[in-house]
Structure formats: C-alpha cells, structure tokens
Amino acid sequence: MNSNQLRETFLNYFKQLDHEVVPGSSLIPENDPTLLFTNAGMVQFKDVFLGVETRPYQRAVSIQPCMRAGGKHNDLENVGYTARHHTFFEMLGNFSFGDYFKRDAIKFAWDFLTNVLKLPPQRLWVTVFQDDFESESIWLKEMKINPERFSRCGEKDNFWQMRDTGPCGPCTEIFYDHGPTISGGPPGSAEADGDRYVEIWNLVFMQYNRDAKGNLLPLAKPSVDTGMGLERLAAVMQGVHDNYDIDLFQYLLKALRTLLKTEDLHNTSMRVIVDHIRSVAFLIADGVIPSNEGRGYVLRRIIRRAVRHGYKLGQEEPFFYQLTKPLVEEMGGAYPLLRKSQALIEQTIKQEEIQFSNTLTKGLKILDHEMAGLPSRQIPGNLIFQLYDTYGFPPDLTADIARERDFVMDYAGFDKAMERQREQSQQAHQFVANYAQKASIGGETQFVGYETLNSQANVISLLQNDQPINRLNESEKGVVVLDRTPFYAESGGQVGDQGFLYFEKGSFRVKDTKKQGDIYLHIGEMLQGHLNVKDKVRAEVDVSRFDIMRNHSATHLLHEALRRVLGERVMQKGSLVEAKRLRFDFSHAKPLTPEELQAVERLVNQQIQANLLSTIEVMTPEEAKKKGALALFGERYGKEVRVLEMGDFSTEICGGTHTERTGEIGLFKIVSESGCAAGIRRIEALTGKAALDYIESAEQQLRSLSDLLKTNRKNLAAKLSQILEDHRKLEKELAKLKQRLASQQLESLINQVVDVHDIRTLAIRLEAVDRETLRAIVDQLKQKLGKAAIVLATIEEGRIQLVAGVTKNCLEHFNATELLAPIAEKVGGRSGGRPDLAQGAGERPENLEAALAAVPKWIEKKLKE
C-alpha cells in the first residue's frame, strides 16, 4: 500500500465512524507564540482541548504536516544518519473532544491496524502507563491481546502533558516488531533503545488537569488525541525497515540520482537532501522566507545544510531547487498548496542557493585550515561563531562537518560569542523599551484618534533620559504620557503621528509616537514654557495624518489588487505607511511584468474612482476569519480586532487609521517595484497630491526628452529605438575592430611566450586595450599554443584589469582562478571565474610588473606539488 493509499484509507475509516475530516493546518501555528512550528496533529485543536474554543463537531480526523527542526523538538542533526529522523513528517490522527474515550479509541486503533491494514497481531506490541489499569483491562480482557506482547511503562514514556500545568493524561502506544534480525528489545526493557520495535501509534487520554501544586484533578469532559507517523506506517506496510526506502523518499532519491548523476541511494548526503526538500518546500508554501531570525532562520539553516551535502557530492552549482518538481509530482495531489506555490518555492530556494554558494567555498577552506592546526579535536566556539557571522554557516552545519571528521563542538564558547554580539546590538534598541518601563508607573492611555485629531488630556507621566521627572522645561527633550490621546502610535506599518501639545503659556512638539502595552509615548521637544505632571493639555495631531490615512487605505486596495492580478497566494510580508509614500512587501516569486503592474495600478484607481465606503467593525478574530478578513501573517491578535471593509472589494484586519471613502485617496501611482528578499517583492507608491506631482514631473521629463531628440512624444519611442539600434551597430563595429587589433598583436605575443616545463606561459601587460579585448586575445592564444597558461593585464582609467586563461590539459595541475588569485592580491584587488577563464581587478599599478613576473615561478612550484 503506497502513501497516498494510506492517507485515503485512514481518512475514510474514521469518516465512516462519524469523524469530521479536518484539513491539516499550516506549519506556522496560529495565535501560539510558544511554538516555532506545528509539531503534532493536536496543535490546531489546542484551544478545543483547553476548553476556550468550541467546534461544531466532537470527533475529528486529520493528516497534519509537522516540523521538528529548531526549538525544543529538533531532529535536524540526526536527519540522514538514522532510519527514522526527519525534519518534516505527516501525522495521522483521530480526536475526541468529550465524546468517546479509552474503550473506543483503543478499539478503533486495533481494528484499523489488524482488520483494515491486515497487520498480524503477533507483530504488534502494546504499552500502557503503569497506573492506567482501565486501559490495561481494555487491552487484555476486551481486545484479548497476547499478554506476552504487552508492558507497563512509567511517566517518562507513557504520560503526556502539554506543559507543566493544564490538560494531561496517560497514553497507550502501539509498536511494530520488525523481527529478530534487528537488534533491540521490547518497550520497557533494558534493550528498548534498539530499532527492532518501532512506535507507530500513540493514543493520549486527556483526563486530568494538573494545577500549580502538581495535583491531578479529573476533567469534566475527558478527550482523546492520537498520532501515527505516516512514514513509519508506510515502512511497515511496504515491508521495509528504513523510512528512506518507502515510496515517498524513493521517488525523490531517484530524481536526485538523475540530477546528480550518482548511483548510491543510501548515501547519507542523498538522504539529507531529500528529507530537507520536503520541509523547505512546505515552509515556503506556508509563507516563510529565509532570514536571520525565527522561522526564517530555521528555513535558511535547512537549505544551507542541503546545499553543503550537495557540495559533498560534487555539486557546486544550484541544484536543490530542482527537487521541487518531483516533490510536487509526488505530494501535490494530497497538498494542493504545494502545487500552487511551486514557482515561489523554486525561486526562493534558487536565490538562497546562489547567495550561499558565494561564501560556502571560502568558509570550508577556512574551516579546513583551522581544523588542521587545532591542538585538540574540539572546534573552538569563536571559530564556530566566525563561520556563522561572516560566512553564514549555521552551527549545525559546522557540527555536521565536525561529526564527519570525529571532532566535537565547543558550544559553550559559541554561546558566549553570541551573547557578546547580542549585548552589543541590544544597546542600540533600549530607547523605547526603557521609556515604556519607566512610563508604566503612570497608568494607561485611552486612544481617541479614530474619531478625532484633537482632544483635551491630562499629563500622567514625564520622562527624560530614561528617568521619571515632574517637570519638563523649555528646549528640553523628553517623553510625555497622557491619559487620552488622538496621536496614533507606530504600529502595523503605519508611522507614529506628529503634532503638538498645547497648554497654558507653552507648547510641546511631538516628533514621534510609540506604544508599549497600553502606554502611548509622545516623544519630542518643549518649544516654550514648561510642563508638569497632572497639567492639562490640548493634543493636536498634524494634518499630515490625512496623507498617512490616504496611504494606509491605499495599501489595503493594493494588497487586494495584487491578489486578484497575481493570485491568492500573494501574502503581505511587511509595509511602511507614512505621509509622503507607502511601501508594501509581498510574497511573489519573480518581478512583475509591466502589464501586471499596469493592471494592479488600474484596479486600485478604479476602486478610488468608485468612492467605496470604508466601514469598520470590532469582532473576535474567529468572527473576522469567517467573514473572510485577511490577517497579517504571523501577527498575534487579542480577543477583539478591527475589521476594515472597503465596499465589497477589500476586507482586512487592521488597527490603523483610514479614509472614510476610497475617493479621498485621490490618485494612486506605483513608482517602483523591486526585490527585497528571496521570494519577496516590494512596491513603492504615492497617493493624492504626491502622485499628481510625480506624474507632472514625468510629463515634464517627457517634454524635455522630446525637445532634446527633436521629435514629438508620439514618435519618442520610435526615435529612441532608432538611436539604440544605431548604437548597437557601432558597438558591433567596435567589437570587430578590437578583434582585429587582438589578431594583429597575436604573433608579437607568441614570440614572448616562455616554456615552464611543457606549459607555454605568458604573463604580460598590454596598452590601449580593454578587458573584452584581453579576453579575446586570451581565447585566441589558448587555441594557438595548445597547452598554455596566460595572464594578460591592462590599466584602464587608473584601474588594473586582469584576465587569466588555462587550457584544459593544465587543469590537473591548477586552474585559472588559482593562477590569478595571487596576482590580484598583490595589486590590491580580487578575482574569480571559471576553471578555464578568470577575471580580476586591482588598485595598485606599481605592483603589477612584479606580480606578472612571478607567474612562471608560481607555475613551476605548482607542477612540483
């Protein structure tokens, strides 16, 4: 039975038992900052188990994609080296929320395994918690399993709890016995760590609530949470012991074999790569992008680990992204989002591969060099940190290399180096946090800025230089905290408001507004007079707020327009809303075409012209989702959210300030579209008068260009095309002249060739040529000389240009990049390229002649190595 059939069989079995088939949730847990990734089927039902959420069903069945890389549950360093560790796996699970309990859960599991899947009972082994006599009785007396294939285990193995307090309970586990040819004893025995008995299903019975004192109190409605790994079950059903031998992995391994032109499907690096493409693809499909923090950093680590293992197999060019296609072929039917996101996944992985490949070789050389000189077999923490900080080597990638060479890692030293860096970076980020900590003495601020731009208020706290003060004097800078304010605090991409606080005989200029918890911090400078705690003020927001409102409303229209033009997979990844402009970051695999940009811009302006009414409702996050409101990826929402609707065009959760009608935006103009990260595009745009000014400026430039080219605007494109075509013709003529010049110099250069053993060698400076001409001459010399190493140089506008060429029959001794590197270094520059052709540049012409003169000796030394 293949994996697709197993998924279908499992869902159908429990569907017939009145279970609601619930789609697996995202790998990114919703509203749960305690979890980095979804790591079990019960995660999406956590609030149901806790009693804070109700569902219209009491029985559920799901197939949940899960991650175990990063955080508490981290299998990354073992992946590829064992038969069953994976970064990504699928969890089959059935759940009861106060409906059936132990008897039915056990009966369903046993029936599915023995009657539906036809697994022989004599190959199964059952464990229960040592004090769970009810489950023991059900197994032995009702299911009548063989008592010799049954054991009791302690709390460590057979008692489950979500955290130190809360729902918990005993569990019963079902193991598959792979037979006596594999080492290991039954669960609960001293030999239980072997691989013979493999857990395939865990049934958790949540029947207690553990209080803060550790007491177990019975739950009013006991529940069931079960989990069974698809990969392990597939191994059992397909008669193999190693998960990498099942259909899912074999399909990917064979695709990788073709890609890398290798035959060893059991190679550890091959296994690492095919495991990692699954977790990487699903994470990107769920909206994660490579970065240097949080989930994005875990994704980056996994990609880089796969790339490094490809490098071990001799693959130095980007290859990992090409496994996306076979993965989609194998799993796209079960997970349509994977198929829908294929282009984004490929583009994101490829960009990350290219970026990392630039530093991988250098980092490996440094590590090789340092390891060769270490006095012990421990890699120092400062070296691990240097590789991480300078060359992007995640510590687990260095640990992989250490493991392969029988070295250990100095993690304590690495942690100290990391801590030093954190302390340095945190010093620059204490401003707002310190103010908020001091301001918390003063209470909270009521925000009234949705209804008005000015209000009366009382000063409840003043701060200066991180310290609470009672009085702020003229010309002094500080922070004012009010009991109520119309000033919007920086949040959700919208900048903080500016304006003034007016009071008797004085004023305070608010330059920025920030928020910490319920405290609004009005940051600025006293213009005149003095201000005391408990004084009354009139708070007035600057009229620039209207421009901010226009731009914020425009971002909502832009977001929806992008989804309609490019597809619903587009997700917001960030934004900046200020008075002068707006910036919007979104997930998309490639640059937008001019036609797509035009369609987006036109669609936004159509909604502005339609003058749609903006309405706001306050509701729970669950109600907002049912309404179809878009939520910002990764945002954690409170009990209530504001939902902004613009006609029937856009519905989003948003706490920002907006125009009452879309017509108030006036005009929308996209001024740039660019990439800001792998798989992330950025649009910058203007609205209102700023957009009109931009268009008028563009019109003026067109008029000036038309005058310059002596044509009207209607014929401007044709005129420019003709000029460019003439330019291309001239460039071709110039190239021919350069080629002719190269040919003319060829005979003279051949006469200056010296023989270093059997390698014809030339290292010389040429005058009045450019780099392209140097390349042409190198190519012709390689053809003429047979077995040759050539370095040509010229000085162009005060800067040295270098080109080196090596014929193929020299590559067993050295290549062009190796040949050119010391020369470039001597002239204060850098070089790079292919094995047969390298290029470089330098800044020290005075060292050039000596550097070229050293080439024959360098070659002679290489030949002796």
Swiss-Prot record:
Its EC number is 6.1.1.7. It is found in: Cytoplasm. It is an enzyme of class 6 (ligase). Its cofactor is Zn(2+). Keywords: Aminoacyl-tRNA synthetase, ATP-binding, Cytoplasm, Ligase, Metal-binding, Nucleotide-binding, Protein biosynthesis, RNA-binding, tRNA-binding, Zinc. SMART domains: tRNA_SAD (SM00863). CDD domains: AlaRS_core. It catalyses: tRNA(Ala) + L-alanine + ATP = L-alanyl-tRNA(Ala) + AMP + diphosphate. One of its GO terms (biological process) is alanyl-tRNA aminoacylation. Zn(2+) binds at residues 552, 556, 654, 658. SUPFAM superfamilies: Class II aaRS and biotin synthetases, Putative anticodon-binding domain of alanyl-tRNA synthetase (AlaRS), ThrRS/AlaRS common domain, Translation proteins. Binds 1 zinc ion per subunit. One of its GO terms (molecular function) is zinc ion binding. Belongs to the class-II aminoacyl-tRNA synthetase family. This is Alanine--tRNA ligase. It comes from Coxiella burnetii (strain RSA 493 / Nine Mile phase I).
